[in-house]
Each structure stands twice: as structure tokens, then as C-alpha cells.
């Protein structure tokens, strides 16, 4: 399994960011997801971004433990919990809360594991970009669904779940002017 060996995987097909956030790691898939693109809609789809705010974004995990496995991360490339701003902390917690509500309705999740791994010894696969895992759970799911030798037993494809989240009325656009706010932030950070 290439992702265990540290292969970060390919960039989204045919897309390169037009603007990276200040301090972004160009090899980090979360920084790539937070970047600005000429075609933002296609980029968000290919980067599996299902929600974003001024300080954080939520990305479906390409290698899920369970259906709906979500990563919530700050837009900034920051590796330690103590380095997050109050706004980043608050927005991340709000995003996690919103997704527990959405997943309870959309995929009938009955419970959730929410956690984070700080640094490689604790299991962090992306130690340079802090992120929380939200893993939906169901009664009798036997901990996590099996992942054996590149064969994953997941009840719904990532494409189907991404589309279902987008189709949800009023979802995910919690910030009407996310792109405008992001562009303002880029100018403020000296990148616009």
C-alpha cells in the first residue's frame, strides 16, 4: 500500500494551483486542497474538499477507515496543535460538529470517532499539517471496515458521498463569500 510508505499520491489531474497560501508545502495534499485554482470548482472536486471556511477545510479521506472518513484541517500548513489560532480551533470544532449532524442524517451514522495524531510516533501520516479525523460508526461495524492489500470494503464510493454532500440543500456553503474571503486573506498574507 503506497500511502503507508509515504507516497503522497498524484496531484489532481491536470490542475496546478494558481496561488498557494503563504508557507504552504507544495507536496502536502492538504495545502494543495487549500490553494486557489483557475477552476476552483473542479479543483475542489478533485481534491475531495467538501467544506471550507476562512480558516479551515474539510476533505474526504482518500484512504478511509470507514465510509465518510473526513479530515478537518487548518488552511495554513501548521503541524502542532499549540500553533493553531483561536479562530482555527473554533472553526475546526464547529466543522466537526456540523459533520456529525450531517452524517447522522445523510449516511445514518450512529456514532463517531474524532481524533488527531500529533507527530509520527503517535501515528501522524502528515505530521507537517495538523488535522482531525472524523470517522462515522455504526452498531456492529466491528471497529473499522477491513482494508486488506489495497482492497477496501467501503459501503459507498467517495464520488457518491462527495456528490451527496454537495446535493444537500444549503450545504456546504456556510460562508457565502468563501472565495472572496479566501482572496482577501491571500492579499492580506501577501500572496494576492
Task: Name every feature range the model reports, one short phrase each.
Residues 1-25, 127, 135-171:
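Conserved His + Asp/Glu catalytic blocks
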Residues 1-67:
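Active-site microenvironments that recognize anionic phosphate/pyrophosphate groups
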Residues 172-192:
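Short, low-complexity, charge-dense intrinsically disordered segments
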Residues 70-93, 149-154:
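Short histidine-centered catalytic/ligand-binding loop motif
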Residues 84-109, 162-164:
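Long, well-ordered alpha-helical scaffolding segments within enzyme catalytic domains
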Residues 107-122:
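A short glycine-rich, hydrophobically flanked beta-strand micro-motif that places a catalytic Asp/Glu
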Residues 28, 58, 74, 92, ...:
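Divalent metal-coordination and catalytic microenvironments
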Residues 124-130:
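A short, glycine/Asx- and small/polar-enriched loop/turn
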